[in-house]
């Protein structure tokens, strides 16, 4: 499974470290990420608030799961 985590803070880093422990996960990507996250996931330079950019990146990478807080604001789990 390919996972994309959206954000660049401590919460996202902690999520990535736990996701990395799963045997079901093959690749982890993060956008925008940060220097610390880059040790655990491949980072891309797309702003977390650029929803169209994040969607395009997710499609380009053929991810199976996107983890992003901003969807909660739109009433999605």
Predicted regions and their residues:
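ATP-binding N-terminal substructure of ATP-dependent carboxylate-amine bond-forming enzymes
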Residues: 1-77
